Amino acid sequence: MAAIKDSLLAQVAEVLPSSGHKVTIVGIGQVGMASAFSILAQNVSKEVCLIDVCADKLQGELMDLQHGSNFLKNPQITASTDFAASANSRLCIVTAGVRQKEGESRLSLVQRNTDILKNIIPKLVEYSPDTILLMVSNPVDIMTYVAWKLSGLPKNRVIGSGTNLDSSRFRFLMSQRLGVAPTSCHGWIIGEHGDSSVPVWSGVNIAGVRLRELNPILGTGEDPEKWNELHKQVVDSAYEVIKLKGYTSWAIGLSTASLASAILRNTSSVAAVSTSVLGEHGIDKDVFLSLPCVLNANGVTSVVKQILTPTEVEQLQKSANIMSDVQAGLKF
Protein backbone atom coordinates (compact mmCIF):
# COMPACT_ATOMS: atom_id res chain seq x y z
CA MET A 1 0.00 0.00 0.00
CA ALA A 2 1.41 3.40 -1.03
CA ALA A 3 2.20 5.97 1.62
CA ILE A 4 -0.34 8.79 1.97
CA LYS A 5 2.22 11.35 0.78
CA ASP A 6 2.89 9.37 -2.41
CA SER A 7 -0.83 8.95 -3.05
CA LEU A 8 -1.48 12.64 -2.44
CA LEU A 9 1.40 14.30 -4.30
CA ALA A 10 2.81 13.72 -7.79
CA GLN A 11 6.32 15.15 -7.77
CA VAL A 12 7.23 17.10 -10.92
CA ALA A 13 10.53 18.71 -9.81
CA GLU A 14 13.09 18.67 -7.02
CA VAL A 15 12.60 21.01 -4.06
CA LEU A 16 15.35 23.63 -3.88
CA PRO A 17 17.55 23.13 -0.80
CA SER A 18 17.57 26.83 0.13
CA SER A 19 15.64 30.02 -0.50
CA GLY A 20 18.84 32.00 -1.02
CA HIS A 21 18.01 34.19 1.97
CA LYS A 22 19.02 31.82 4.74
CA VAL A 23 19.92 33.40 8.08
CA THR A 24 21.97 31.60 10.70
CA ILE A 25 21.93 32.84 14.29
CA VAL A 26 24.72 31.63 16.56
CA GLY A 27 23.77 31.78 20.23
CA ILE A 28 20.26 31.12 21.55
CA GLY A 29 20.38 33.28 24.64
CA GLN A 30 17.93 36.12 25.20
CA VAL A 31 19.41 38.27 22.43
CA GLY A 32 19.69 35.45 19.91
CA MET A 33 16.11 34.35 20.39
CA ALA A 34 14.76 37.90 20.37
CA SER A 35 16.61 38.39 17.08
CA ALA A 36 15.24 35.13 15.66
CA PHE A 37 11.69 35.97 16.69
CA SER A 38 11.90 39.51 15.29
CA ILE A 39 13.27 38.25 11.96
CA LEU A 40 10.54 35.62 11.68
CA ALA A 41 7.68 37.83 12.89
CA GLN A 42 8.63 40.59 10.44
CA ASN A 43 9.05 38.09 7.60
CA VAL A 44 12.64 39.25 7.02
CA SER A 45 13.66 35.70 6.15
CA LYS A 46 11.73 32.48 5.59
CA GLU A 47 14.74 30.32 6.46
CA VAL A 48 16.38 30.55 9.89
CA CYS A 49 18.97 28.21 11.37
CA LEU A 50 19.85 28.29 15.07
CA ILE A 51 23.29 27.16 16.26
CA ASP A 52 24.29 26.63 19.89
CA VAL A 53 26.27 24.24 22.10
CA CYS A 54 23.36 23.58 24.48
CA ALA A 55 21.54 20.76 22.67
CA ASP A 56 18.51 20.45 24.97
CA LYS A 57 17.74 24.17 25.10
CA LEU A 58 18.35 24.38 21.36
CA GLN A 59 15.78 21.66 20.69
CA GLY A 60 13.30 23.31 23.02
CA GLU A 61 13.63 26.71 21.36
CA LEU A 62 13.37 25.10 17.93
CA MET A 63 10.17 23.26 18.81
CA ASP A 64 8.65 26.33 20.42
CA LEU A 65 9.20 28.38 17.25
CA GLN A 66 8.18 25.57 14.89
CA HIS A 67 4.89 25.15 16.72
CA GLY A 68 4.08 28.75 15.79
CA SER A 69 4.87 28.27 12.08
CA ASN A 70 1.19 28.57 11.20
CA PHE A 71 1.28 32.16 12.48
CA LEU A 72 4.60 33.05 10.82
CA LYS A 73 3.78 32.41 7.14
CA ASN A 74 5.34 28.94 7.15
CA PRO A 75 9.07 29.55 7.61
CA GLN A 76 11.69 26.82 7.54
CA ILE A 77 13.32 26.77 10.99
CA THR A 78 16.18 24.42 11.79
CA ALA A 79 18.66 24.03 14.63
CA SER A 80 21.87 22.15 15.31
CA THR A 81 25.00 22.02 17.42
CA ASP A 82 26.90 21.30 14.18
CA PHE A 83 28.01 24.32 12.13
CA ALA A 84 27.49 22.27 8.96
CA ALA A 85 23.78 23.11 9.36
CA SER A 86 24.63 26.75 8.68
CA ALA A 87 25.85 26.01 5.14
CA ASN A 88 24.88 28.46 2.38
CA SER A 89 23.75 31.21 4.74
CA ARG A 90 23.31 34.62 3.16
CA LEU A 91 23.68 36.23 6.58
CA CYS A 92 25.26 34.91 9.78
CA ILE A 93 24.33 36.71 13.00
CA VAL A 94 26.57 36.10 16.00
CA THR A 95 25.07 36.75 19.44
CA ALA A 96 27.04 34.11 21.34
CA GLY A 97 29.22 35.21 24.21
CA VAL A 98 29.50 35.73 27.92
CA ARG A 99 26.61 37.84 29.18
CA GLN A 100 27.33 41.30 30.54
CA LYS A 101 26.93 41.43 34.30
CA GLU A 102 25.20 44.19 36.23
CA GLY A 103 27.50 47.21 36.32
CA GLU A 104 30.09 45.55 34.08
CA SER A 105 31.60 47.55 31.22
CA ARG A 106 31.23 45.98 27.79
CA LEU A 107 34.97 46.28 27.32
CA SER A 108 35.72 44.04 30.30
CA LEU A 109 34.11 41.18 28.37
CA VAL A 110 36.59 41.41 25.54
CA GLN A 111 39.09 38.57 25.96
CA ARG A 112 36.51 36.00 27.10
CA ASN A 113 34.34 36.66 24.08
CA THR A 114 37.34 36.79 21.74
CA ASP A 115 38.18 33.24 22.79
CA ILE A 116 34.61 32.17 22.04
CA LEU A 117 34.73 33.69 18.55
CA LYS A 118 37.82 31.65 17.69
CA ASN A 119 35.57 28.57 17.69
CA ILE A 120 32.74 30.21 15.73
CA ILE A 121 33.87 32.53 12.96
CA PRO A 122 36.16 30.18 10.97
CA LYS A 123 33.43 27.52 10.92
CA LEU A 124 30.77 29.93 9.67
CA VAL A 125 33.00 31.10 6.84
CA GLU A 126 33.99 27.53 5.99
CA TYR A 127 30.37 26.56 5.35
CA SER A 128 29.21 29.92 3.95
CA PRO A 129 32.18 31.61 2.24
CA ASP A 130 29.94 34.22 0.57
CA THR A 131 28.11 35.18 3.75
CA ILE A 132 27.85 38.54 5.48
CA LEU A 133 28.71 38.50 9.18
CA LEU A 134 26.57 40.60 11.52
CA MET A 135 28.13 40.77 14.97
CA VAL A 136 25.96 41.46 18.00
CA SER A 137 28.11 39.98 20.80
CA ASN A 138 29.55 42.58 23.17
CA PRO A 139 31.75 44.53 23.22
CA VAL A 140 30.47 44.67 19.67
CA ASP A 141 33.03 47.02 18.12
CA ILE A 142 35.96 44.92 19.30
CA MET A 143 34.14 41.69 18.42
CA THR A 144 33.51 42.97 14.90
CA TYR A 145 37.22 43.70 14.51
CA VAL A 146 38.04 40.22 15.87
CA ALA A 147 35.53 38.60 13.51
CA TRP A 148 37.05 40.43 10.55
CA LYS A 149 40.56 39.25 11.50
CA LEU A 150 39.40 35.66 12.02
CA SER A 151 37.19 35.45 8.94
CA GLY A 152 39.40 36.67 6.14
CA LEU A 153 36.33 38.38 4.65
CA PRO A 154 36.47 41.89 3.18
CA LYS A 155 35.61 44.64 5.66
CA ASN A 156 32.33 45.53 3.96
CA ARG A 157 30.97 42.05 4.76
CA VAL A 158 31.80 42.12 8.48
CA ILE A 159 29.41 44.44 10.28
CA GLY A 160 28.63 45.19 13.91
CA SER A 161 25.19 46.10 15.25
CA GLY A 162 27.01 49.06 16.76
CA THR A 163 25.09 52.17 17.76
CA ASN A 164 21.97 51.37 15.76
CA LEU A 165 20.25 50.63 19.07
CA ASP A 166 21.87 53.61 20.83
CA SER A 167 20.50 55.88 18.10
CA SER A 168 17.05 54.33 18.54
CA ARG A 169 17.21 54.94 22.29
CA PHE A 170 18.32 58.52 21.62
CA ARG A 171 15.37 59.14 19.30
CA PHE A 172 12.93 57.60 21.74
CA LEU A 173 14.14 59.85 24.56
CA MET A 174 13.91 62.87 22.24
CA SER A 175 10.36 61.88 21.36
CA GLN A 176 9.39 61.76 25.02
CA ARG A 177 10.60 65.32 25.55
CA LEU A 178 9.07 66.76 22.40
CA GLY A 179 5.85 64.78 22.06
CA VAL A 180 6.84 63.71 18.54
CA ALA A 181 7.01 60.13 17.23
CA PRO A 182 10.50 58.55 17.50
CA THR A 183 10.57 57.98 13.73
CA SER A 184 10.16 61.74 13.24
CA CYS A 185 13.08 62.51 15.56
CA HIS A 186 16.41 62.57 13.72
CA GLY A 187 19.54 62.11 15.78
CA TRP A 188 22.61 59.91 15.67
CA ILE A 189 24.86 58.27 18.20
CA ILE A 190 28.20 57.29 16.66
CA GLY A 191 31.49 55.81 17.86
CA GLU A 192 31.58 53.04 20.44
CA HIS A 193 28.49 51.09 21.36
CA GLY A 194 29.13 51.91 24.98
CA ASP A 195 30.51 54.45 27.39
CA SER A 196 32.52 56.57 24.90
CA SER A 197 29.73 56.90 22.33
CA VAL A 198 29.29 60.30 20.68
CA PRO A 199 25.94 62.10 20.35
CA VAL A 200 25.88 64.22 17.19
CA TRP A 201 24.04 67.18 18.71
CA SER A 202 24.93 69.36 15.73
CA GLY A 203 22.69 67.26 13.49
CA VAL A 204 19.69 66.66 15.76
CA ASN A 205 16.58 67.85 13.95
CA ILE A 206 12.83 67.56 13.56
CA ALA A 207 11.54 68.02 10.00
CA GLY A 208 14.83 69.64 9.04
CA VAL A 209 14.75 72.13 11.92
CA ARG A 210 18.05 71.75 13.75
CA LEU A 211 17.49 72.04 17.48
CA ARG A 212 20.84 73.83 17.83
CA GLU A 213 19.40 76.65 15.73
CA LEU A 214 16.79 77.06 18.46
CA ASN A 215 19.22 76.47 21.32
CA PRO A 216 22.92 76.96 20.42
CA ILE A 217 24.09 75.30 23.65
CA LEU A 218 21.97 72.16 23.15
CA GLY A 219 23.74 69.13 24.58
CA THR A 220 26.32 71.11 26.54
CA GLY A 221 26.73 71.39 30.30
CA GLU A 222 25.49 75.00 30.14
CA ASP A 223 22.11 74.07 28.66
CA PRO A 224 19.40 74.91 31.26
CA GLU A 225 17.11 72.26 29.72
CA LYS A 226 19.84 69.67 30.32
CA TRP A 227 19.47 67.89 26.99
CA ASN A 228 22.90 66.40 27.62
CA GLU A 229 21.18 64.11 30.13
CA LEU A 230 19.65 62.24 27.17
CA HIS A 231 23.05 60.92 26.15
CA LYS A 232 23.78 59.83 29.70
CA GLN A 233 20.43 58.02 29.71
CA VAL A 234 21.35 56.30 26.44
CA VAL A 235 24.68 55.12 27.88
CA ASP A 236 23.11 54.03 31.17
CA SER A 237 19.97 52.46 29.71
CA ALA A 238 21.42 48.99 29.07
CA TYR A 239 22.85 48.90 32.59
CA GLU A 240 19.45 49.98 33.94
CA VAL A 241 17.55 47.32 31.99
CA ILE A 242 20.04 44.66 33.11
CA LYS A 243 19.61 45.80 36.70
CA LEU A 244 15.82 45.57 36.43
CA LYS A 245 15.28 42.39 34.38
CA GLY A 246 18.70 40.74 34.24
CA TYR A 247 19.43 41.20 30.52
CA THR A 248 18.52 43.20 27.43
CA SER A 249 16.74 41.44 24.59
CA TRP A 250 13.77 42.92 22.76
CA ALA A 251 15.25 46.23 21.59
CA ILE A 252 18.52 44.68 20.40
CA GLY A 253 16.54 41.87 18.74
CA LEU A 254 14.45 44.40 16.83
CA SER A 255 17.58 46.36 15.92
CA THR A 256 19.20 43.20 14.57
CA ALA A 257 16.12 42.37 12.49
CA SER A 258 16.14 45.87 11.04
CA LEU A 259 19.77 45.48 9.92
CA ALA A 260 19.07 42.00 8.55
CA SER A 261 16.17 43.42 6.56
CA ALA A 262 18.36 46.09 4.96
CA ILE A 263 20.88 43.44 3.91
CA LEU A 264 18.51 40.71 2.71
CA ARG A 265 16.11 43.09 0.97
CA ASN A 266 18.95 45.11 -0.58
CA THR A 267 17.36 48.38 0.54
CA SER A 268 20.47 50.59 0.80
CA SER A 269 19.10 51.94 4.08
CA VAL A 270 21.32 54.12 6.26
CA ALA A 271 22.02 52.81 9.76
CA ALA A 272 24.61 53.44 12.46
CA VAL A 273 26.64 50.23 12.35
CA SER A 274 30.15 49.28 13.33
CA THR A 275 32.52 49.32 10.37
CA SER A 276 36.17 50.04 9.64
CA VAL A 277 36.78 53.74 10.35
CA LEU A 278 40.44 53.99 9.36
CA GLY A 279 40.79 57.28 7.50
CA GLU A 280 37.36 58.58 8.54
CA HIS A 281 37.28 61.92 10.41
CA GLY A 282 41.06 61.90 10.81
CA ILE A 283 41.13 58.50 12.55
CA ASP A 284 44.51 56.82 12.05
CA LYS A 285 43.72 53.62 13.96
CA ASP A 286 42.55 50.38 12.32
CA VAL A 287 39.44 50.00 14.46
CA PHE A 288 35.73 49.37 13.99
CA LEU A 289 33.29 52.01 15.25
CA SER A 290 29.81 53.11 14.28
CA LEU A 291 29.14 55.68 11.60
CA PRO A 292 26.03 56.08 9.42
CA CYS A 293 26.48 53.47 6.67
CA VAL A 294 24.57 52.43 3.56
CA LEU A 295 23.52 48.80 4.03
CA ASN A 296 22.46 46.44 1.27
CA ALA A 297 23.08 42.97 -0.16
CA ASN A 298 26.84 43.61 -0.32
CA GLY A 299 27.03 44.72 3.30
CA VAL A 300 28.37 48.22 3.94
CA THR A 301 28.81 49.86 0.53
CA SER A 302 29.20 53.50 1.63
CA VAL A 303 29.89 55.54 4.74
CA VAL A 304 27.98 58.80 5.05
CA LYS A 305 30.35 61.77 5.32
CA GLN A 306 28.73 63.39 8.32
CA ILE A 307 29.63 67.01 8.96
CA LEU A 308 30.76 67.03 12.59
CA THR A 309 31.84 69.83 14.89
CA PRO A 310 35.46 69.88 16.12
CA THR A 311 34.24 68.68 19.53
CA GLU A 312 32.38 65.73 18.00
CA VAL A 313 35.43 64.79 15.91
CA GLU A 314 37.61 64.94 19.01
CA GLN A 315 35.20 62.70 20.92
CA LEU A 316 35.08 60.22 18.01
CA GLN A 317 38.87 60.08 17.82
CA LYS A 318 39.00 59.51 21.57
CA SER A 319 36.59 56.59 21.13
CA ALA A 320 38.90 55.20 18.42
CA ASN A 321 41.92 55.48 20.70
CA ILE A 322 40.09 53.55 23.44
CA MET A 323 39.26 50.75 20.98
CA SER A 324 42.84 50.68 19.71
CA ASP A 325 44.24 50.37 23.23
CA VAL A 326 41.94 47.44 23.99
CA GLN A 327 42.75 45.72 20.69
CA ALA A 328 46.45 45.98 21.43
CA GLY A 329 45.97 43.66 24.41
CA LEU A 330 44.01 40.99 22.53
CA LYS A 331 45.36 37.48 22.27
CA PHE A 332 44.23 35.70 19.09
From Swiss-Prot:
Pathway: Fermentation; pyruvate fermentation to lactate; (S)-lactate from pyruvate: step 1/1. Its EC number is 1.1.1.27. Substrate binds at residues 106, 138, 169, 248. Keywords: Cytoplasm, NAD, Oxidoreductase. GO terms for molecular function: alpha-ketoglutarate reductase activity; L-lactate dehydrogenase activity. The keyword Ion transport does not apply. It is found in: Cytoplasm. GO terms for biological process: glycolytic process; lactate biosynthetic process from pyruvate; lactate catabolic process; lactate metabolic process; NADH metabolic process; pyruvate biosynthetic process; pyruvate catabolic process; pyruvate metabolic process. SUPFAM superfamilies: LDH C-terminal domain-like, NAD(P)-binding Rossmann-fold domains. NAD(+) binds at residues 29-57, 99, 138. InterPro entries: L-lactate/malate_DH, L-lactate_DH, L-lactate_DH_AS, Lactate/malate_DH_C, Lactate/malate_DH_N, Lactate_DH/Glyco_Ohase_4_C, NAD(P)-bd_dom_sf. Gene3D superfamilies: Lactate dehydrogenase/glycoside hydrolase, family 4, C-terminal (3.90.110.10), NAD(P)-binding Rossmann-like Domain (3.40.50.720). Pfam families: Ldh_1_C, Ldh_1_N. PANTHER family: L-2-HYDROXYCARBOXYLATE DEHYDROGENASE (NAD(P)(+)), L-LACTATE DEHYDROGENASE. Homotetramer. This is L-lactate dehydrogenase. It comes from Drosophila melanogaster.
